[in-house]
Amino acid sequence: MTDTADAVVVGGGAMGASIAYHLAAAGAGRVVLLEREAALGTGSTGRCAGGFRIQFSSEINVRLSLASVALIRGFEAEHGLPLDLDVDGYLFLVRDDASWPGYRAAAATQRSLGARVEELDAAAAEALIPGLNVDGVVGATFGPDDGIADPSGLTNGYATLARRAGAQIRLGTAATRIWTSPDGGRVTGVSTPDGDIDAPVVVNAAGVWATALAATCGVELPIHPEPRHVVTTSGFPGRPERRTLVIDTATMFYFHREGAGVLMGMPRLADAVATFETVVDDRWVAEELLPQAVRVLPAIEDAGLARSWVGLYEMTPDRHAILGPVDGLAGLYLANGFSGHGFQHAPIVGKITAELVTGAPPTVDVSSLRLERFARGELIGESHVV
């Protein structure tokens, strides 16, 4: 059986749901969103920490964040749908004299583009988060407009809006192939287990599975999965009252208040090897993550572990997303490789993707993020990957 659509979006995380909504709302015709699992947001979206921030080191990420954070913070007022969020900021702690100038330069870039970012000394950082170990801290940056939002709420909110705008969402339906014209110059649709869908526009928002899908139409994406552990604790005396997300830049250990306890995580050296494995390494949690947690917030020593899980980042060589059309393959649009910040950029990327598809001027110029930058050697670089 062959179906038809004007645009097919592959991937039902926050990114795909946002793209589907914005396409439908922009009048892109019949929009179909395909999600391989039985529910939306069960991949990287459902396993992320939910943070959103303006504090990045590259100008393009700051511009995207400024626009996306505004959409997140205004979501409930604009759409009339509930979204649980806390705007208590992000705090980056720097304990290395050699690294501090780079963080100050990043803060200057952020402020030059309109962000509110403060530079704090150790005492001010401890005053913000009482109980924080600031021994050796040479400086900190604090973004008061950064915060934490509910990933499920945002994803399902955009899905609700997409349906209201006329989009169709098909759960339990994987896109197994992207088809192209005989001359290979444009996409013509996708295959699913239920049959083909003919469509002149296909948006690949398949997260860590995007590389395999793109390969079916001859497009090579330089993306690999990188597992990240997340752990939550029970309540404990001295738990911070603010829901500020605190990052110790020496190891990129982070935590924020979550319920009665905290949610925390940290990159693991072994995870630099590309793998789709999502099994929790309990020994690493006990021997590496927890000692680091106690070093940063000593009161955590009295907490018990509640839950732990592993999610996957979709990493690119320059730790920036791959966005936009593909040279030589009309109708294919990419929204991939967000390197850990896909959830927070989903609102604005959905809007920009719809603008690119419909020919409207993009809210943010993302031409520097096109796939072709890798072949040209025009990598960007981002130091603030948590």
Annotate each PLM feature.
Residues 63-66, 93-102, 141-160, 170, ...:
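Short beta-strand to alpha-helix junction loop
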Residues 24-45:
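Glycine-rich FAD pyrophosphate-binding loop
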Residues 2-15, 32:
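Beta1/beta-strand and adjacent pyrophosphate-binding region of the FAD-binding site
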Residues 141-200:
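Helical element adjacent to the flavin cofactor pocket in flavoenzyme catalytic cores
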Residues 220, 235-331:
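Active-site lid/adjacent beta-loop-alpha segment flanking the redox-cofactor pocket in flavoenzymes
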Residues 49-128, 252-254, 292-293:
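Dinucleotide-binding Rossmann-like beta1-alpha1 core, especially the glycine-rich loop
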Residues 41, 195-242:
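Central helical "cap/lid" subdomain
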Residues 291-386:
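C-terminal catalytic lobe of FAD-dependent flavoproteins
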